[in-house]
Every structure is written in structure tokens, then in C-alpha cells.
Amino acid sequence: GSDPTSDPVLMKRGLVAGIDYEKIQSPNIVCFHGSAHALLMLSDVRPEARMFIAPLAETLAGRAHWTPVCGFEDEVTDAIIDGDDLYLLVNRNAPRGRLVKTSAAAPRLADAAEVVPQGRTVLESIARARDGIYLLILDGGISRLRKLGAAGHGADIALPHGADSALPHGADIALPHVADIALP
């Protein structure tokens, strides 16, 4: 490998005009396999993030023109890019979460299509795997895993008794892990 001191700096405080953030906030640039876009997530101790998007090629070249996606006030807690689609997990006016979709090339949260409406369960996180999009759902304290299908309908994936689920971004599959619990 190369010397890390020669790596380009893609984001830091004061590097890009218009993208200011507090000392407590940290930038994270996320890329998704097969997407031509990169997502910049600014986060702190809140579950919500402030997000921007830019073409991946421009980002890697160090000349990204970041387009705003959402602010902290929009209460977006998770996001993935699937091809040309940007999926956002939104809690604003939906405390149990809802999943919306907008264009990655020209995101408009206000006009995003609702993919999964708020329901009786809590949408905790989303992840993209090779075979689709997965939702981690909390149902009365029990974790559930659902693979998103056409028109927002999903297929529940049975987890072994005592299993929780982890949703690593970009994995080939969503992997369950067994929690340490006492069984009666």
C-alpha cells in the first residue's frame, strides 16, 4: 500500500464552502457498490444526520460539488443508495419511522416517494445487500428482519430464537447474531 500521509483529504472542517459543521460533528463519506454517487453524512450524538450527495468520480478526484439532501431538522436517521435511488429512513412526523425514495442525482426529500409507511413496528435501520434491501424492525422489543420487495411489501426473514440482527452496509447478505439472553 501507499503511505497514508499522501492520501487526499476529501472532507474536513473548512475545506468545502457551504458545508460548515460543529466541532462535535464528524463527517463520514459512504459509497455503495454499483452507485455513481457518494453520500456525506455529518453526525454527532443525535440519531439524526445531516446529509449531502455528490458524484462519486468528483468525490474521489477531490472536487465534489455536494448537493444537500437533508438537515438535522428533517430527522433522517439512515440512508442507502441503490443504483440511482436514494432511500432515506425518516422519523419526522413518523416517530416509528418511514422509508422514502428519491433520485440520487437530484434528491428532493419533500417530493420523495413513500416506500414503507409508518406502521405499528419501529423501522430501526436499512441496509443494501447484493440481493436487495433489508429493514431492521423493532417489534415490541424483539428485532425482526425484513427483505424489501416490490411496491414496499416485504418478506419477513425468520431469525433463530434469541437472535438479533446486524445490517452491515454492502454485505452479500444480512447476518443474524445471537444475543446473550437467559432462556427460561
Regions found by a protein language model. Name each.
Residues G1-P184:
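Peripheral, non-catalytic segments that deliver or gate enzyme domains
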